Regions:
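Structural preference for beta-rich elements and adjacent junctions enriched in aromatics
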Residues: 1-196
Length: 196
């Protein structure tokens, strides 16, 4: 007897850039500042582009990220350049993208379904949600979802909500426990070397 199985396929061409995430080798201290030994072994990503793609104008300011991992966590850091550093959302799970924000999308099985979305602003306000399917396929986020064990920090080189200040950038550090991502992993474990 044969059984037909439907496997989700992305509705748009899908060829994201590749980043090799190295294993962390040094002790970590969460403070939002990425100018420290922990991040020295992590290369920067390419500069971020508009979410709509490379056909859009280049961003006015540079944003780049770094990532590392160990047996328990995925570590993400980013530097967001800018001469005005704005943030107003202060309530968890508010619509953070109304402010300048940093966003992370994690899809443990790489099928573009059952993935986690994370956003944070310069005030260290977090919005984390789960999506069973992408927005483009009619999905909507589960706003009440909270990523257990998530830790975040922000460092500001300048002043928040003061355009007259000498603002340079803000940086973020995000610690995502692998255990928080197990629900939709085929194997409920942290990645092994070569998988991440």
């Amino acid at each position: 007897m044969s059984t037909n199985i439907t496997i989700p396929v992305p509705a748009v061409p899908f060829a994201p850039p590749v980043y090799t995430c190295h294993r962390a080798k040094k002790p970590f201290e969460l403070d939002g500042n990425i100018n420290k030994p922990f991040w020295e072994d992590a290369p920067y990503t390419d500069e971020f582009l508009d979410i709509e793609g490379s056909h859009m104008p280049l961003p006015r300011f540079v944003t780049r990220a770094k990532m590392l991992w160990d047996d328990e966590n995925l570590y993400v850091a980013a530097v967001l350049d800018g001469d005005e550093i704005w943030g107003h959302q202060t309530e968890r799970d508010s619509v953070i993208f109304l402010d300048n924000d940093f966003e992370i999308f994690v899809d443990p099985d790489s099928d573009t379904y059952h993935y986690y979305e994370f956003e944070m602003n310069v005030l260290n306000t977090v919005w984390d949600l789960f999506l069973s399917e992408p927005y483009r396929d009619g999905g909507s986020g589960l706003n009440g979802y909270d990523m257990h064990g998530l830790r975040t920090a922000v460092h500001v080189d300048g002043s928040i909500n003061d355009p007259s200040a000498e603002n340079k950038c803000w940086s973020v550090e995000v610690v995502i426990p692998f255990a928080a991502l197990y629900e939709y992993q085929k194997e409920r474990r942290a990645p092994k070397n070569g998988e991440f």
